[in-house]
Each structure stands twice: as structure tokens, then as C-alpha cells.
């Protein structure tokens, strides 16, 4: 996930303030290599055995590894909110939008409604704006913005309206999303 983060992090020096996510990822890979840790990406663990041996599928091949310790880092998965129409083409998660923009240089769409005002929703909304997308609104069921004020302020300064205490009722369209209905929550 760090390799998709083109923005600079903030906070304390120990939390990698003022360093871009992809640079943090590169540094962590170098640290792991220097410590003798073998990092295997895009792999699937097929079996784990009592003697600390694992079998791993990498591409079309099965590999065996044995070590003193096994660390399982499963990665992250998006937590999609489901609603009628959520499977229509054009309804995507923030991570997919970020991958399209930051890794492939592709605009995820022209007019975007962002669901979620946590740091991910705020940062990705700002990245969408920088990419040339129109973020038409930011919607969150919570009564307050969930992310850091600095991220919310950047988005707000662009004129994006925030609909707090609201959620998506349905995505509209037949073969792709053409609109969204939102409603206030209790």
C-alpha cells in the first residue's frame, strides 16, 4: 500500500514525517534486505507446517521455505460498503482509484462522489482533484470528519461539499453508474 502513496506523510520524525509513501516502502525493503529478511511479494502461502516450513506459490511454481520464525503479512483489503448498485462498473474503492492514478496514470473517472471522510477518503479525494477529476461531494455516515484536519482543509478549500451524517442509498444506472442517491442517517 505504501507504494501507492505519493503524498508526504506528516507527524513525528519517527513516523516518517515529510517522506512520501513509496520512499518509505523502498527504505523498508532495504532495511529488510540488510537484516537478511527475504521479502516475497505477489505470492500465496499454500501450506504451513509445524517445523516452521511453508510452501509458497510464486507465479506457476511452488517453493519451500524454512526458517527460525514465520511472519505473515497479509496486506490490506478494502472494506466496501454495499448498497443497491454497488457492483456497477464505475463504483470502485479508494484503493483502486489510487492504483489507477498513482501507478498507472489513469483518471478513475470525471465526476467522483467519495464515501468516507477518514484519512483515506480525504487523501484520495485530494489526489483525485490533483488528477483532474471533479469530486462532487464527500459523504460520511459519521457526524464528524474522521480524518486529520489538515487533509479535510485541503479538500474543503477546493469547494467540495461535505455531507456528514449521510450515506449512499443506491448507485443508479444500467450498465455503468450514472448517479448516486444519498440520504441523511439517524
Report residues per predicted region:
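A Rossmann-like FAD-binding core segment of flavoenzymes
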Residues: 27-56, 129-186
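Conserved N-terminal glycine-rich FAD pyrophosphate-binding loop of Rossmann-like flavoproteins
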Residues: 1-19, 78-90, 146-160
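Glycine-rich nucleotide phosphate-binding loop and flanking beta-alpha elements
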Residues: 78, 119-121, 145, 169-170
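Rossmann-like NAD(P)H-binding beta-loop-alpha module
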Residues: 1, 89, 98-143
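Short, surface-exposed, polar/charged, turn-prone segments marking secondary-structure boundaries
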Residues: 18-21, 67, 98-102, 110, ...
